[in-house]
């Protein structure tokens, strides 16, 4: 058998490597042009386009918005002000350690839904895209406009993934809620305002263990969550998975952590305020959510 000479082998390697460099150069040039031409308004438009969902078996309320808000929320809520770790930077939920946190079950659907937009606009980081998706979703559900700025980076490995257990748990009491939110840097007023996002979406037993909608219109961002907390008789029942949850006569549900907002005097003060004034809640929620998106930067 005749083997190629050393010079022939080198020539073949050179040809292959040259072809590889040409491909890399074209890709780098494409990305460079893309970055120069980056347009967040186009990304926003594409995000709006993916929100309506015809498959009401999977998306009972006909929209992807609540799930994208949850993705944005949870990607920020790992922040620890004491160690200055976690938060919206890094898009660390791409890695198994964070993706496997019990609080993030089901969010792979949200992440995968954003992949076509990421491929279309490769210049935007995952970290920025996830947060922008949440902001756009709030606005699409008639919620307040949220100030948003870019500049988040994607971590190249999982070395800076925050530990599991930092997300709020639905079965927690007022002490748990206050501990989790104060660790992120929120006071009681901001905490209650942020939890008002439970006006959107619904609980799924295969994700959280709880089941049912919080409000009568899970696709509308308003202050109904607070009104329902105060204006209903809530009965403690078992969810399909055996977790304790509260239900009213019309089928809305609350988790123990939700009910803690009217059991704790300091939290209750703000529930009362927001139930009366949607405008006040919208103003406070917009500021608190903006603060949430900036954690860890």
UniProtKB/Swiss-Prot annotation:
Annotated site residues (Transition state stabilizer) in this chain: 70
PROSITE patterns from the UniProt entry: PEROXIDASE_1, PEROXIDASE_2, PEROXIDASE_4
Residues bound to heme b: 198
Disulfide-bond pairs as recorded: none
Keyword ATP-binding attributed: no
Residues spanning the signal sequence: none
Cofactor: heme b
UniProt entry keywords in alphabetical sequence: Heme, Iron, Metal-binding, Oxidoreductase, Peroxidase
Cofactor note: Binds 1 heme b (iron(II)-protoporphyrin IX) group per subunit.
Gene Ontology MF annotations: heme binding; metal ion binding; peroxidase activity
This enzyme's EC code(s): 1.11.1.-
One of the GO BP terms on file: response to reactive oxygen species
Annotated function: Destroys radicals which are normally produced within the cells and which are toxic to biological systems.
Family assignment from sequence similarity: Belongs to the peroxidase family. Cytochrome c peroxidase subfamily.
UniProt cross-references to PANTHER family, sorted A to Z: L-ASCORBATE PEROXIDASE 3, THYLAKOID LUMENAL 29 KDA PROTEIN, CHLOROPLASTIC-RELATED
Protein's recorded name: Putative heme-binding peroxidase
């Amino acid at each position: 058998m005749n083997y190629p000479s050393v010079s022939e082998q080198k020539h073949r390697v050179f040809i292959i490597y040259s072809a590889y460099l040409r491909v890399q150069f074209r890709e780098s040039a494409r990305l460079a042009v893309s970055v120069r031409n980056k347009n967040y308004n186009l990304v926003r438009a594409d995000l709006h386009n993916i929100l309506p969902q015809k498959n009401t078996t999977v998306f009972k309320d006909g929209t992807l918005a609540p799930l994208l808000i949850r993705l944005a929320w949870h990607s920020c809520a790992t922040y620890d002000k004491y160690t200055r770790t976690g938060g919206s930077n890094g898009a660390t939920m791409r890695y198994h350690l964070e993706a496997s946190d019990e609080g993030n079950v089901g969010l792979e659907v949200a992440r995968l839904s954003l992949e076509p937009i990421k491929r279309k606009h490769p210049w935007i980081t995952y970290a920025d895209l996830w947060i922008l998706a949440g902001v756009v979703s709030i606005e699409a559900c008639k919620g307040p406009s949220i100030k948003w700025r870019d500049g988040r980076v994607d971590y190249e490995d999982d070395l800076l993934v925050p530990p599991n257990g930092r997300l709020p748990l639905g079965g927690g009491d007022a002490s748990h809620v206050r501990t989790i939110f104060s660790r992120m840097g929120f006071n009681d007023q901001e905490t209650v305002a942020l939890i008002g996002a439970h006006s959107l979406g619904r609980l799924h037993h295969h994700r959280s263990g709880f089941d049912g909608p919080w409000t009568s219109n899970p696709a509308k961002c308003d202050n109904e969550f607070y009104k329902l907390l105060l204006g209903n008789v809530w009965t403690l029942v078992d969810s399909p998975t055996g977790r304790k949850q509260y239900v009213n006569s019309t089928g809305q549900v609350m988790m123990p952590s939700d009910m803690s907002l009217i059991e704790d005097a300091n939290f209750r003060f703000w529930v009362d305020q927001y139930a009366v004034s949607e405008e006040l809640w919208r103003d406070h929620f917009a500021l608190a959510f903006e603060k949430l998106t900036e954690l860890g930067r």
